[in-house]
Regions:
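Bacterial N-terminal signal peptides
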Residues: 9-19
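Sec/Tat signal peptide C-region and signal peptidase I cleavage site
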Residues: 20-26
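Periplasmic OmpA-like peptidoglycan-binding domain that tethers envelope proteins to the cell wall
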Residues: 308-313, 326-330, 334-405
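Bacterial N-terminal signal peptides that target proteins for export
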Residues: 1-11
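Solvent-exposed loop/turn segments at secondary-structure junctions
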Residues: 160-162, 200-201, 302-304, 339-343, ...
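Signature of exported/secreted
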Residues: 27-284, 288
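Stable alpha-helical elements in mature extracytoplasmic
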Residues: 109, 146-149, 314-317, 321, ...
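Periplasmic peptidoglycan-binding/tethering modules of Gram-negative envelope proteins
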Residues: 249, 260-332
Length: 405
């Protein structure tokens, strides 16, 4: 009986070894590349325990979400463009808070942080309009060579940080060592699994002249697991384990320990059959299909002079729009304000932002969740008519609502 048990265990062991070897060597050689995709949602979620000079402050929970739209090459980009480069226009917004007891951070109408960038075939990301996001640039990136499980490569990337939320972003170069693990399935999608490690090193010769002048140095370690879409080359999931310390010239040291997670999601498809007909019946509402989604332009919208306060009667139009938007249960709405050109660029920018937020608040007051609105102001930078006539200026004073998809 003992001899029989031994034989069974021996053959079971041999089978397991054979299965393992076959599984490893059956993995095909692969070529990683960024092929681009249509519109997508990028989410960066951090859960970091913060310590100031060794004293525990709390769990810093932060979520940065964005709606990113594929776009044509911007007119401002003239040289150094590869035909395979992909260009994107992003609207980022931040939800942040400090938790000690797991309480949920309150949310509401979001202010857009605009961003424009391009991504090369190897995953290198170059900023065109930089307001601090995305915070990981050129990560992950891919080699030109064919890869087998266990193969390694190194590549530089940039991480944009603002540890104290001062509104001053410091860009830190990082040298990342990648390892290709295997091909696998994730939620029904073919993906590549990659691991990555790098060290945070800042200070001395590594210095960002445009960054936080109070930041003296930074050091730490990162270890990440990455799932990359085989179809698009997008990193659909990154889970980064972090331990890093930022030192300031005033003697303050801030340490963060925890995780940073990145997700790629895709916006819901909007069923336009139920909304195009009622929209066509609304007065002074122009409906247009754009790369971001269906855009509603509220024409001749009347505000008090130099104010975000609507004139009496305008709320009736907004109520009719809200009735339609309520029938779109999952989509986000981008509300973008525009002004005529009066020569006061900064004033126009502020006024356009305030008017966008005023419209979003009015729509939210009808029962649409406030956290579905992203507000953006473009001042007088996007005219649709000449500002040399009263009629043209009236057309330029408008608010656009895009149903993002």
């Amino acid at each position: 009986m003992k001899k029989y048990d031994f034989v069974i265990k021996f053959f079971t062991f041999c089978f397991c070894i054979l299965y393992f070897v076959q599984n490893v060597y059956s993995q095909e050689s692969v070529k990683l590349s960024y092929n681009g995709s249509g519109n997508y949602i990028l989410v960066e979620r951090t859960d970091l325990r913060r310590y100031d000079n060794g004293r525990y402050i709390g769990l810093m929970s932060r979520e940065v979400r964005s709606f990113i739209t594929a776009m044509e090459k911007p007119e401002t980009v003239f040289a150094g463009v590869n035909p395979l480069d992909k260009f994107y226009d992003g609207n980022f917004y931040v939800i942040e808070g400090t938790k000690r007891s797991g309480q949920q951070v309150a949310s509401g109408i979001h202010d857009s942080i605009p961003s424009v960038f391009k991504i090369s075939k190897t995953g290198e990301l170059s900023m065109i309009e930089d307001n601090g996001y995305p915070s990981f640039r050129g990560f992950p990136s891919y080699p030109e060579e064919i890869l087998n499980p266990g193969d390694k490569w190194q590549s530089y990337a940039i991480r944009a940080v603002d540890p104290l939320n001062k509104g001053v972003v410091t860009k830190i170069p990082i040298l990342v060592e990648y390892t290709f693990i295997r091909s696998e399935m994730y939620r029904g999608e073919d993906v590549f699994r990659i691991s990555a490690k790098w060290a945070t090193r800042y200070g001395g010769s590594i210095f960002d002249a445009e960054g936080d002048s109070d930041l003296k140095s930074a050091m730490g370690s990162h270890s990440a697991n990455i799932l990359v879409s085989k179809k698009t080359g997008n990193a659909i999931l990154v889970h980064d384990t972090v331990n890093e310390t930022f030192a300031y010239f005033d003697g303050k040291q801030v340490n963060f320990k925890g995780t940073i997670s990145l997700f790629t999601e895709y916006p819901p498809v909007v069923d336009k059959t139920d909304i195009l007909e009622p929209l066509s019946k609304l007065d002074s509402i122009k409906v247009e299909k754009t790369s971001k989604g269906l855009m509603l332009t509220i024409e001749n919208l009347r505000f008090k002079p130099d104010s975000a306060e609507l004139l009496p009667g305008e709320e009736i139009r907004l109520m009719k729009i809200a009735e339609i938007l309520r029938n779109i249960p999952k989509s986000m709405f981008l509300v973008e304000g525009h002004t005529a050109s009066t020569g006061n660029v900064s004033g126009e920018q502020s006024l356009s932002e305030e008017r966008a937020k005023s419209i979003a608040m009015s729509l939210a007051n009808t029962g649409i969740s406030a956290d579905r609105f992203i507000c953006k102001g473009s001042g007088s930078k996007k005219p649709i008519a000449s500002n040399s006539t009263k009629e043209g200026m009236s057309l330029n004073r408008r608010v656009e609502i895009t149903i993002l998809e």
